Curated annotation (Swiss-Prot):
Catalytic residues as annotated in Swiss-Prot or TrEMBL: E55 (proton donor), D116 (nucleophile)
One Pfam family in the UniProt entry: Glyco_hydro_8
Family of the protein in this entry: Belongs to the glycosyl hydrolase 8 (cellulase D) family.
Native species: Escherichia coli O157:H7
Protein name per Swiss-Prot or TrEMBL: Endoglucanase
Gene: bcsZ
């Protein structure tokens, strides 16, 4: 009888372990060990100042939500509020850069904002409020989104409402600078429920993506001039590289039900064609000519997983990611991999409304 009981206990323990194993996201667990402090600070160790950015904090919040990791989410949120927002994301946009100063003090290094981190943070808070049924997250997310609209959205003659990359330094009297990778179309769709300026920002953001890629490659940065439009043949060559790689990934993550997805995929098809032909995405591309150079790092291959529509080409990039998985000193490659590979593994999807569809599963929900 004791043997039977012992065997039953062992089976139950193994079953519980297998459920827990099925619920965990190994790449996320490793990322936490390698890149997130116990206090909730996402660290980029490649910089000697051991920097933290609002982008990194916002991505950490998204991954924690996708993984149903509320403890990590709270840690990251608390650190962000206390160190980047002087205690409250309701009261101010987070500073974009924090790290070690020359005098060895740890503090904000640049108090300007970065709207890519801000929109991901607001969206993650709003979705955390919905999925975890926690009003506090919803309240902070709503206040943050209103502040983004007030401080980072401008009206551009000939375009309409546009999201600046930050609140300072990107707008002159007749010229504005934009980063096409800062507002994913899915998030732009989600924010339309909150009314102006988001209802029109979705369309102007689509124009930014579609009109600045004449050869099918999105620029990292682009300038718009009043009465002259997009400056695609500027004195300085426009490059598609480490920022723009996210554009293709965001487009690939759009739900198939979104009527704009096919149009976006068609616009950026040259990027898919190059990757399929060469077995890797390019590191840099001249936006005006379409001339590519260099082999993109492993994070670029991960970013291609949602974007590529050819299954054989997808498999090549999937294998490249598996064979060259980022280590503990490759923050940006790792976050691209969590996004791209995580999507490829069906750990999350987005609805037509831009809401998160996490793969928590009933067993996972019951095991927490």
């Amino acid at each position: 009888m004791n043997v039977l009981r012992s065997g039953l206990v062992t089976m139950l323990l193994l079953a519980a372990f297998s459920v827990q194993a099925a619920c965990t996201w190994p790449a996320w667990e490793q990322f936490k060990k390698d890149y997130i402090s116990q206090e909730g600070r996402v660290i980029d160790p490649s910089d000697a100042r051991k920097i933290t950015t609002s982008e990194g904090q916002s991505y950490g919040m998204f991954f924690a939500l996708a993984a149903n990791d509320r403890a990590a989410f709270d840690n990251i949120l608390d650190w962000t509020q206390n160190n980047l927002a002087q205690g409250s994301l309701k009261e101010r946009l987070p500073a974009w850069l924090w790290g070690k100063k020359e005098n060895s003090k740890w503090e904000v290094l640049d108090s300007n904002s970065a709207s890519d981190g801000d929109v991901w943070m607001a969206w993650s808070l709003l979705e955390a409020g919905r999925l975890w049924k926690e009003q506090r997250y919803t309240d902070i997310g709503s206040a943050l989104l209103k502040r983004i609209a007030r401080e980072e959205v401008v009206t551009v003659p000939g375009l309409g409402s546009m999201l600046l990359p930050g609140k300072v330094g990107f707008a002159e009297d007749n010229s504005w600078r934009f980063n096409p990778s800062y507002l994913p179309p899915t998030l732009a769709q989600y924010f339309t429920r909150f009314g102006a300026p988001w209802t029109t920002l979705r369309e102007t953001n689509q124009r930014l993506l579609l009109e600045t890629a004449p050869k099918g490659f999105s620029p990292d940065w682009v300038r718009y001039e009043k009465d002259k439009g997009w400056q695609l043949k500027a004195e300085k060559t426009l490059i598609s590289s480490y920022d723009a790689i996210r554009v293709y990934m965001w487009v690939g993550m759009m739900p198939d039900s979104d009527p704009q997805k096919a149009r976006m995929l068609n616009r950026f098809k040259p990027m898919a064609t190059f990757t399929e032909k060469n077995g890797y995405p390019p590191e840099k591309v001249d936006v005006a000519t379409g001339k590519a150079q260099g082999k993109g790092p492993v994070g670029f291959s991960a970013a291609m997983l949602p974007f590529l529509q050819n299954r054989d080409a997808q498999a090549v990039q999937r294998q490249r990611v598996a064979d060259n998985f980022p280590g503990s000193d490759a923050y940006y490659n790792y976050v691209l991999t969590l996004f791209g590979q995580g999507w490829d593994q069906h750990r999350f999807r987005f609805s037509t409304k831009g809401e998160l569809l996490p793969d928590w599963g009933q067993e996972c929900a019951n095991s927490h």
